[in-house]
Amino acid sequence: MKNLFVLLTTGMMVSASFAQSSDSSTYYYNRGLDEKNARRYREAEKNFNKSFQLDPQNLDNLLQLASTLMEQHRYAEAREKYHKAEVIDPNNKLVVENLATLSFNMRKWEDVIRYVQKMQQLKIGKGADFLMARSYYELENYGEAIKYCELAVKEDAKNAQIYYIAGRSFMDMHNYKRAAGCFDQALALDSTNSTWMYEAGLVWYAVPNDQKALYWIEKAGEKGYKKSNDYMENLASAYLNAGKFDKGISVLQEILKKKPQDQELLYSIGEAYYKTKKYPEAIEYWDQVLILDNKNANALYMMGMAFQKKGDTQRGVMLCDKAIEMDPSLKKLREERKMPGGL
């Protein structure tokens, strides 16, 4: 009888304690809602946390806590809370959709795919195919990326990023013509993205279409793309390839001020002058290459060609012969009357 009394008493105490805990959890939950509605998110978070400590299985409280963390841009912590909510209710639509979005923003690409597939099963949310396309692209699965781009464009044909992802996927598979078409479609929808413009220029260069390559590389610079040495060198190449030699040479000379002993730059300027039949200038720049590297057979050979073009045949032939001694493969160029590089 005494044991029964102890059990009953203990049971009543546990029940009372549970009820008190539940009441306290509800109290802090309601206070959290009030603070959140007043946009005092830090105070709301404190109350939702107290409620969570008292009742970890309260799904509504967990969702409010996660939402409050998101309002404070604390996405990793919010994602952790949504994961706890997922354990309680794996098919909760709000939980699944937010986990997909947070995983996307945090570049957790495999998780994005998993949650988007769940979104599709639950038939919720929008833009699922775009999220899949981007995730597969980042995972370097370009075939799947393009497949989902084709699906995504049916849902939102005005989303420029869809065409950009498709373009990058084709580019990374070296299908430059398809890539170029996608870049053009992306830029038709977003005419402000200088990075896309620059990449479009590089893709058109690879096609090759020299005029379109120059157009987009120039446009990128006009729209604010950083004019790094790499950008300027590609701009110079685009000018030269498009036959605008004066502009190309001018850009190369500007770069040379920053990289005064760059042999490739010096060689390229000499090559550009040679193509415009300015042979003394070409000789001057190839001579600078040889000062830096007297074993550069290509520069020596081209000096010889330039001397021949300007009428000093004997000296030119002598230099070409010396270059061929240094690099016998140049003999074939003489026979074909080509420049090094097949030009």
Predicted regions and their residues:
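N-terminal leader/linker segments that initiate helical-solenoid repeat arrays
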Residues: 2, 17-76, 80, 87, ...
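Terminal, low-structured helical/coil segments at or just beyond the last alpha-helical repeat
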Residues: 24-26, 241-243, 301, 305-343
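TPR alpha-solenoid repeat register
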Residues: 27, 61, 95, 128-129, ...
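Canonical tetratricopeptide repeat
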Residues: 30, 64-67, 71, 98-101, ...
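Register position in tetratricopeptide repeats
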Residues: 37-38, 71-72, 105-106, 138-139, ...
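Structural marker of alpha-solenoid helical repeat scaffolds
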Residues: 54, 88, 121-123, 155, ...
